[in-house]
């Protein structure tokens, strides 16, 4: 039975918001929040047919709610939920994914039902701890874990990281054979049809959604498809759009075909680690973040749940590998063979990076390093060793190590792109001249710097500047809205030594200010003693310029050291490089 409910906010001047409930399986109710007029989803893509936010209620001997809804539905959703179930009897909240359109009402739900146990991946629970700002019961799950609600409803969990967030899990009810997928297999399509009766009408939006959200993680899509392949699925309960019932094999086949095409020419790095061991989760995510800045795809592989075939395939196909030291074989009988599988699969054209996991029983890092070197692999960065608990400086080291690895893999691609520009256009663009500057930033114990030339004044009121910062620059992580920095202006006749210093290729974690005279600005960032002038700035916004961030910042204060001196000028002849 399908029930439609109008939201009180659906007056003519307001977006149309309605609710729909339907029994979709034994003891199972779908709650669909229909957002008819939403025309944009985050910054990722335009919406042509609105969207829906779907959640699901399962009543066994225990009761579980799978996901919640967008905050714009707060009053009507929570009231409907209380009409469907006594919230004091709600036992579990399954969080497949924590983006606000699915988790926006979790704080409100926990106020009404503080006894609820929140079930999700480790990353999801960590995120919710920051979102909720109050203690709550939680249960961390991953592939192989299950939860028995009684009356035949045994929930099985499947890890699906990077679809399209690192926290994603899928939930399968073996009793009803319903697969709950949140964003995966969804589409932004709003209408009253509960199921996918007309695939030809839905296909364009289904593919558009895949291209915008899932295509960049195609290899992760294929891994998720492999994990759900053994399941008998009669209904795919998605988080957006209609539920998939009539054409399941078609939709899953499309994901498979599109992803297979995507990965054929994709350069990617496989990062092997052991989830929950030491601080490997934190380090591998930070290294992966650094790699992603260079445009190289990543594949995170938890060795505690991966199978031999998966490890072998990824180790063979990856352009680069990162390995976090697992516990020694004396404490684990399953991980040592997987290390052997990696060693047997790699080849000399690959690059490698290693890090200690800090679990107390790590495999020794240097013997493994020697094995990879003997097999002919090129080392992308020095082994990352943990002498103390990780700090912000450790995060900086890992992020820069990942960026170095990614830059190594994209170097040839960048060189090819530089030669593809029309020669006359290349020379014409090269006639654009700018000043020379050193951008410095510090946040806590982490500080960085870069030579900058793509700098212009962007506004009078407020006083603002725009700086183009390549996405793979180390300092990029210190230039988000709200961050502060100093723009040091180089002097025409006194810039060579500073320019040469900051053009050096620094190893990951190196002090870029060693040997340079500095003093702190009011905002804490370093001012270079030998520069002509400086401006203290705060980042206001960033515009995505494909390979650069265009960072708009307001000027807080500044000073000139030599009134009669001129700014150093950067003259180019070609536009395809700095």
UniProtKB/Swiss-Prot annotation:
Residue ranges annotated for the Flavodoxin-like domain, each copy included: 269-406
GO molecular function list: FMN binding; metal ion binding; oxidoreductase activity, acting on the CH-NH group of donors, NAD or NADP as acceptor
Region of interest called Zinc metallo-hydrolase, as start-end residue ranges on this chain: 48-240
Record note on cofactor: Binds 2 iron ions per subunit.
Family annotation (CDD domains): flavodiiron_proteins_MBL-fold (cd07709)
Annotated region described as Flavodoxin-reductase-like, given as residue ranges: 429-578
Binding site for Fe cation 2: 101, 183, 240
The protein's name in its UniProt record: Putative diflavin flavoprotein A 2
Cofactor: Fe cation
Any single Pfam family the record assigns to this protein: ODP
């Amino acid at each position: 039975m399908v029930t439609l409910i109008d939201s009180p906010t659906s007056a003519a001047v307001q977006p149309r918001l309605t609710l729909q409930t339907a029994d979709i399986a034994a003891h199972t109710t779908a709650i669909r929040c229909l957002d008819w007029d939403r025309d944009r989803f985050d910054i990722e893509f335009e919406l042509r047919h609105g969207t829906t936010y779907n959640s699901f209620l399962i009543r066994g001997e225990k009761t579980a709610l799978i996901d919640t809804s967008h905050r714009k539905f707060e009053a009507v959703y929570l009231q409907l939920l209380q009409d469907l179930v006594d919230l004091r009897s709600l036992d579990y909240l399954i969080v497949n994914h924590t983006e606000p359109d699915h988790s926006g009402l979790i704080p409100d739900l926990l106020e009404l039902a503080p006894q609820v146990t929140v079930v999700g991946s480790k990353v999801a629970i960590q995120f919710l701890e920051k979102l909720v700002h109050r203690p709550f019961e939680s249960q961390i799950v991953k592939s192989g874990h299950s939860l028995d609600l009684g009356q035949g409803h045994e929930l099985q969990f499947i890890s699906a990281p990077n679809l399209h967030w690192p926290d994603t899990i899928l939930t399968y009810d073996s009793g009803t054979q319903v697969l709950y997928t949140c964003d995966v297999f969804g589409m932004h399509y709003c209408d009253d049809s509960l199921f996918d009766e007309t695939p030809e009408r839905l296909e364009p939006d289904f593919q558009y959604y895949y291209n915008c959200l899932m295509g960049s993680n195609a290899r992760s899509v294929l891994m998720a498809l492999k994990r759900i392949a053994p399941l008998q699925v009669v209904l795919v309960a998605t988080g957006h759009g209609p539920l998939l019932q009539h054409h399941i094999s078609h939709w899953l086949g499309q994901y498979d075909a599109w992803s297979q095409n995507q990965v054929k020419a994709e350069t990617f790095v496989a990062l092997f680690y052991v989830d929950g061991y030491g601080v490997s989760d934190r380090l591998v995510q930070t290294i992966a973040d650094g790699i992603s800045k260079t445009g190289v795809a990543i594949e995170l592989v938890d060795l505690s749940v991966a199978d031999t075939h998966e490890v072998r395939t990824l180790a063979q196909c990856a352009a680069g590998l990162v390995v976090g030291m697992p516990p020694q074989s004396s404490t684990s009988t399953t991980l040592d063979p997987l290390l052997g599988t990696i060693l047997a699969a790699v080849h000399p054209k690959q690059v490698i990076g290693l890090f200690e996991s800090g679990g107390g029983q790590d495999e020794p890092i240097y013997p493994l390093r020697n094995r990879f070197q003997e097999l002919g692999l090129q080392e992308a960065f020095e082994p990352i060793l943990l002498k103390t608990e990780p700090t912000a400086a450790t995060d900086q080291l890992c992020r820069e190590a990942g960026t170095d690895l990614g830059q190594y893999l994209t170097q040839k691609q960048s060189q090819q792109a530089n030669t593809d520009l029309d020669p006359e256009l290349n020379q014409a663009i090269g006639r654009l001249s700018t000043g020379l500057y050193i951008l410095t930033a510090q946040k806590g114990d982490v500080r960085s710097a870069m030579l900058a030339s793509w700098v212009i004044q962007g506004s009078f009121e407020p006083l603002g500047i725009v700086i183009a910062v390549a996405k793979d620059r180390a300092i990029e992580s210190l230039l988000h809205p709200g961050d502060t920095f100093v723009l040091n202006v180089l002097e025409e006749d006194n810039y060579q030594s500073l320019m040469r210093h900051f053009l050096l290729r620094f190893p990951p974690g190196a002090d870029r200010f060693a040997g340079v005279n500095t003093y702190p600005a009011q905002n804490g960032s370093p001012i270079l003693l030998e520069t002509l002038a400086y401006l203290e700035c705060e980042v206001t916004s960033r515009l995505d310029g494909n390979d650069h961030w265009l960072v708009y910042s307001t000027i807080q204060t500044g000073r000139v050291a030599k009134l009669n001196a001129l700014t150093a000028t950067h003259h180019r002849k070609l536009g395809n490089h700095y």
